[in-house]
């Protein structure tokens, strides 16, 4: 069930429409504070321990435990590649290895969202017989176009051979369908795949090495009390635990701190990707065409761009999407509404006119590149795929590097597991060879070559400076320049105070090309058990109003692409309170990344909840 939004949820709504000006005025005191007590928002046990709650006295908290050789968290391209490669090696060498894979989505692929234009290199390495097996690679790229948009015009830019955005030899895919197919291959090889099980906790041995994971408890009321149906989560123990949670994984966040994995790298920087699927007029359908743009409606200092892919899926289907770098500065910016505005560009709207939108979704993505990759291994576990972040940003691709990292991890794990001279200083195996092998692979070479392109957009010319840098230095030196540019810090630190920014007045959606937020989220299939604690937890319930609303005019109500956060009037007294509509959450992780106070902590809801994407 989706939660309907109200115009009162945005204090600035009345402000904009009463004044009808584009100048930021001093913020009004009533929305900054109230004499009444701060309403309790967070009831989750990660913030309010159950040991201190009398309602939990006498509840059986024992957990059942299972043992495996390898446990993998996340059934995306990386996690499935690791599982499949492990079982391939085991079959080749006659070894018996138990591999368990847990996935929080109700079905494999239901939480997967990407463009996606696939570089098939790693996929073909993993499945040399992919054609015979019927892999859903149905749309080879036949036409590749890139352009700069102004408000009214499209300026074509040639894609020269060797530039990272060249898509010759690639395939347009529905990544959710490809992941679902990979899940079938994994199960056929003997991988134990458990959809609907959300990994909620990292378990440790007494020596500090990773022991495995525990899935989350189910049967807890919204107020934090146990239901009569309460069930403790399951523990999965393994010699090696592989974390393939995707971008900004909530367990990876804990591991970064536990093992200081980010001590020698830049802060990760992110983007938010929004996507829709459309069925269009068959006369406008060009199967295999790839379109990318930069520029309007974003200004030059806001990194981002768009894609429009024509799929050959038996019907005139196109994937349209928009990416906004989460290092943007204006708190009034709404990535969702920028996306809706972009579709009205004279070069985009004609393709969609007369068509029907059939799906919507959003997901954060890593943009930090080589400089932001953390240490990948630690006693008992390792990180693969988009969890550490192997996306090639100028290439606009990360699936191929994620898959290769999974395969390399599997090969390193298998070698250590089956070694006759296995020695380990810790109970959980430390597979250090994985990071060494990755740095010697084409993944590292590819990311090293493009390492300076994304941070080159931070200069006075913004995105256009990055394009100039690419055209000169990358074209000539191919990434061999003897310097490495730095990112400018975490995305949460980049917002300016609202008083220093110009409000953005977005056009009203027309219901044909552009749409409102609620009708969009409805197309994601998102659903959560209503009577459970909100999985969007706050470290301090007072901060959203006292700091975020006061200083930044409540940016969470705009950066969330699903209408999860609303500022609504207090029932008693003056001022506002934050309302969290957790049922709407599409698990994109943007709030955890962009919150300027770093007060929001995304944790897993009950397994099986969230979006139900069909081939996104």
Swiss-Prot record:
The entry's localization annotation reads: Mitochondrion inner membrane
Q: According to the UniProt entry, which regions are intramembrane?
A: 108-129, 427-446
Q: How does it get modified after it is made?
A: Acetylation of Lys-95 and Lys-222 is observed in liver mitochondria from fasted mice but not from fed mice.
Give me the residues that bind a ubiquinone, please: 304-305
What keywords are assigned to this protein? 4Fe-4S, Acetylation, Electron transport, FAD, Flavoprotein, Iron, Iron-sulfur, Membrane, Metal-binding, Mitochondrion, Mitochondrion inner membrane, Oxidoreductase, Phosphoprotein, Transit peptide, Transport, Ubiquinone
Query: Might you give the EC number(s) for this enzyme?
Result: 1.5.5.1
Q: Fetch the Pfam families from UniProt.
A: ETFQO_UQ-bd, Fer4_ETF_QO, Thi4
Which residues are recorded with the post-translational modification N6-acetyllysine? 95, 131, 222, 356, 415
Which reaction is recorded as catalysed by this protein?
A: a ubiquinone + reduced [electron-transfer flavoprotein] = a ubiquinol + oxidized [electron-transfer flavoprotein] + H(+)
> According to its UniProt record, which cofactors does this protein need?
[4Fe-4S] cluster; FAD
| Swiss-Prot/TrEMBL GO biological process terms | fatty acid beta-oxidation using acyl-CoA dehydrogenase; response to oxidative stress
Q: How are cofactors bound according to the entry's free-text note? A: Binds 1 [4Fe-4S] cluster.
> What's an example GO cellular component term for this entry?
membrane
- Phosphoserine modified-residue sites: 550
Q: Which residues bind [4Fe-4S] cluster?
A: 560, 585, 588, 591
UniProt-listed Gene3D superfamilies:
3.30.70.20, 3.30.9.90, FAD/NAD(P)-binding domain
> What residues span the transit peptide?
1-32
Domain 4Fe-4S ferredoxin-type residues, every copy: 576-605
Using the chain's own numbering, where are the disulfide bonds? none
Q: Name one GO molecular function term.
A: ubiquinone binding
- Any idea what job this protein has? Accepts electrons from ETF and reduces ubiquinone.
What is the protein's quaternary organization? Monomer.
Family in the record: Belongs to the ETF-QO/FixC family.
Name assigned to this protein: Electron transfer flavoprotein-ubiquinone oxidoreductase, mitochondrial
């Amino acid at each position: 069930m989706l939660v309907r939004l109200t115009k009162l949820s945005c204090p600035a709504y009345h402000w904009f429409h009463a004044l009808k000006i584009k100048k930021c005025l001093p913020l009004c005191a009533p929305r900054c504070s109230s004499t009444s007590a701060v309403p309790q928002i967070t009831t989750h046990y990660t913030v309010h321990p159950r040991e201190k709650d009398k309602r939990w006295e006498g509840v059986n908290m024992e957990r059942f435990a299972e043992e495996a050789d390898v446990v993998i968290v996340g059934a995306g391209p990386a996690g499935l590649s690791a599982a499949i490669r492990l079982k391939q090696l085991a079959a080749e060498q006659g070894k018996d290895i138990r591999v368990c894979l847990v996935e929080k989505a109700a079905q494999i692929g239901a939480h997967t969202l990407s463009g996606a234009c696939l570089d098939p290199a790693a996929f073909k390495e993993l499945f040399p017989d992919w054609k015979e097996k019927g892999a859903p690679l149905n749309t080879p790229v036949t036409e590749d176009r890139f352009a700069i948009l102004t408000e009214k015009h499209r300026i074509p830019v040639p894609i020269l051979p060797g530039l990272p955005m060249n898509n010759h030899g690639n395939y347009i895919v529905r990544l959710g369908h490809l992941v679902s197919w990979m899940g079938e291959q994994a199960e056929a090889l003997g991988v134990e795949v458990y959809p609907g099980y959300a990994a909620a906790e990292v378990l440790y041995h007494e020596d500090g090495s990773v022991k495995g994971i525990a899935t989350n408890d189910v049967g807890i009321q919204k107020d934090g009390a146990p239901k009569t149906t309460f069930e403790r989560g399951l523990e999965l123990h393994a010699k090696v635990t592989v974390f393939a949670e995707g971008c900004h994984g909530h367990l990876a966040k804990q591991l970064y701190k536990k093992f200081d994995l980010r001590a020698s790298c830049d802060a990760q920087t992110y983007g938010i990707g929004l996507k829709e699927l459309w069925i269009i007029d068959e006369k406008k359908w060009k199967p295999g065409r790839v379109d990318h743009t930069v520029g309007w409606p974003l200004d030059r200092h806001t990194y981002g761009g768009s894609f429009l892919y024509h799929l050959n899926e038996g019907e005139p289907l196109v994937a349209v999407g928009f990416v906004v770098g989460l290092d943007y500065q204006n708190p009034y910016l709404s990535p969702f509404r920028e996306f809706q505005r972009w579709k009205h560009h004279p070069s985009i709207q004609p393709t969609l006119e007369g068509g029907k939108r059939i799906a919507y979704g959003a997901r954060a993505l890593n943009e930090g590149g080589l400089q932001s990759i953390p240490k990948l291994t630690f006693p008992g576990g390792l990180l693969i795929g988009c969890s550490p972040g192997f996306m090639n940003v100028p290439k606009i691709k990360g699936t191929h590097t994620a898959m290769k990292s999974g395969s390399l991890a599997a090969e390193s794990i298998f070698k250590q597991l089956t070694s006759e001279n296995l020695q380990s200083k810790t109970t959980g195996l430390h597979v250090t060879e994985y990071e060494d092998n990755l740095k010697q692979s084409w993944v590292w070479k590819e990311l090293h070559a493009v390492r300076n392109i994304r941070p080159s957009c931070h200069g006075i010319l913004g995105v256009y400076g990055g394009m100039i840098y690419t055209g000169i230095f990358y074209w000539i030196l191919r990434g061999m320049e003897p310097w490495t540019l730095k990112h400018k810090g975490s995305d949460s630190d980049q917002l300016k105070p609202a008083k220093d920014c110009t409000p953005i007045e977005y056009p009203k959606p027309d219901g044909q090309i552009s749409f409102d937020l609620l009708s969009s989220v409805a197309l994601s299939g998102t659903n959560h058990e209503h009577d459970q604690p909100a999985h969007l937890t706050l470290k301090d319930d007072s901060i959203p109003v006292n700091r975020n609303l006061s200083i930044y005019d409540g940016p969470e109500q705009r950066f969330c692409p699903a209408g999860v956060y609303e500022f609504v009037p207090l029932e008693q007294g003056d001022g506002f309170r934050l309302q969290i509509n957790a049922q709407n959450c599409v698990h994109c992780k943007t709030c955890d990344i962009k919150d300027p106070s770093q007060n929001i902590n995304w944790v897993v809801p009950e397994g099986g909840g969230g979006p139900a994407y069909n081939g996104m």
